Structure formats: structure tokens, C-alpha cells
A protein has these predicted regions:
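A positional/architectural concept
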Residues: 1-57
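Charge/polar-rich, low-complexity and marginally structured segments
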Residues: 54-164
Length: 164
């Protein structure tokens, strides 16, 4: 259970701060503990969701992010040739919002992008959009934990990975 002012990842919706913990009747005569969440990035959004929502998870702390960044050079591309299966798998990863899986997705699509550039081709629009969304989700979490601007995360990651 989260506390007020905690930061949480709400699947692919992004990072939110728990503003309040309330009791709300989502079903008649069945009060349920709910979180009132406010978005941290982008358009200000407020959401009320049950505390039992499986899409909510704690934002990774700095140590967890450091470990993930250290492991990134060891990750290999996990490209799925079947376009439909790839889209389904990647959408599921985006919905889940797990940082490690997002990093794996980014590496897979980025590796494919580099291979295509060698042949003077480009990614499909869907793959490019998924790469952008995955980077955005991961950068939000890193930005919050490191207390840096989201726009600075890519440069920070590049400098960290160059030193590995």
C-alpha cells in the first residue's frame, strides 16, 4: 500500500503522485480504498483508482535504476520478426510499464533501427512510435529518481553507457 505523496508508475499512463487515500463505493455498499493520483509529467491529470489496481507499482529508486543502467550493455536485442506478435508483445510491455522490460524493448527496437539504417531503410511507423513511448516512460522514471530534467536523461544515459 502506498502513502500520500508517494510516486507511482500507473502502467503506460506514466508517473503519478498519490495525493489522497480515500474510501469510495465503486460497487454499491462495498467501500474500497482508492488512491487519488495526480500526474507528474505532461497535462495535469487526476485519476481515482482502487488501491488493488495491479497496474500500480512503486517508482524505481536510484539504486535500482543504477543496476538497470549497468545491465543495459549486457542486454541483447530480442527482436520479434512477426509484426503482429511483436506489436502485441511490445504493447503489453508498454502497458505494464516495467523499467527493465522497457529497457529491453528500447534496445531491441534501437538495434533493429541501426540495422535498417545500414540498408538505408527506416523503422515502421508503429515500431518508431513504440520506441518513442518506451523511451518517454523510462526517461520519466529516471528523471524523477535522479532529479534531472526529462530532456537531459538521454544525454545522461549515453554518458553512463560510454563509460562502461
Amino acid at each position: 500500500m502506498f502513502k500520500e505523496k508517494d510516486y507511482v508508475r500507473y502502467g503506460s499512463r506514466g508517473i503519478f503522485q498519490v495525493e489522497q487515500i480515500i474510501k469510495k463505493e465503486l460497487k454499491p455498499r462495498h467501500p474500497e480504498t482508492c488512491y487519488v493520483l495526480s500526474s507528474v509529467y505532461g497535462i495535469h491529470t487526476q485519476i481515482v483508482t482502487p488501491a488493488s489496481n495491479p497496474q500500480l507499482r512503486r517508482v524505481m529508486n536510484r539504486e535500482e535504476i543504477d543496476r538497470m543502467i549497468d545491465e543495459m550493455p549486457l542486454l541483447e536485442s530480442d527482436w520479434i520478426d512477426d509484426k503482429r506478435k511483436r506489436e502485441e508483445t511490445y504493447r503489453s510491455i508498454l502497458e505494464e510499464g516495467d523499467g527493465h522490460k522497457l529497457a529491453q524493448l528500447i534496445i531491441s527496437i534501437y538495434s533493429q533501427k541501426q540495422d535498417k539504417l545500414k540498408d538505408r531503410k527506416s523503422l515502421s511507423r508503429t515500431d518508431a512510435e513504440m520506441l518513442e513511448r518506451a523511451e518517454d516512460l523510462l526517461h520519466e522514471e529516471i528523471s524523477l529518481s535522479y532529479k534531472i530534467k526529462k530532456e537531459e536523461v538521454a544525454d545522461y544515459l549515453l554518458s553512463r553507457l560510454k563509460n562502461k
